[in-house]
């Protein structure tokens, strides 16, 4: 796992009602990741980018929906989500991390 690959593994944080509840109650963060990313890569990427200890990573692949475009059927892309459990005592503030990245 080289550093360039690790910086590309995490595509975006997922901000939703469910992800906010998980962050508050279980200390879990939710990210959209590359479809071919592995759990060790995701763990290393979060630890590298945000400087926190990761306890566990759970992944799920959401299959793309079939959508109609006029007379033709199309399909949206599959999306892989990673639920990252932080170690006890660790906290991740995405707004502060984004502000720090903007300053650099």
Swiss-Prot record:
Q: Which GO terms describe its biological process?
A: translation
Among the entry's GO cellular component annotations, what is one?
Answer: cytosolic large ribosomal subunit
* Keyword rRNA-binding listed: yes
Q: Does the keyword rRNA-binding apply?
A: yes
GO MF terms listed in the record are: rRNA binding; structural constituent of ribosome
Keywords, ordered alphabetically = Ribonucleoprotein, Ribosomal protein, RNA-binding, rRNA-binding
Q: Name one Pfam family in it.
A: Ribosomal_L23
Q: What does this protein's UniProt record list under function?
A: One of the early assembly proteins it binds 23S rRNA. One of the proteins that surrounds the polypeptide exit tunnel on the outside of the ribosome. Forms the main docking site for trigger factor binding to the ribosome.
Provide the family line: Belongs to the universal ribosomal protein uL23 family.
- Give the note: Present in outer membrane vesicle formulations which are used as vaccines in human.
Which proteins does it associate with, and in what oligomeric form?
A: Part of the 50S ribosomal subunit. Contacts protein L29, and trigger factor when it is bound to the ribosome.
In Swiss-Prot or TrEMBL terms, this protein is called Large ribosomal subunit protein uL23
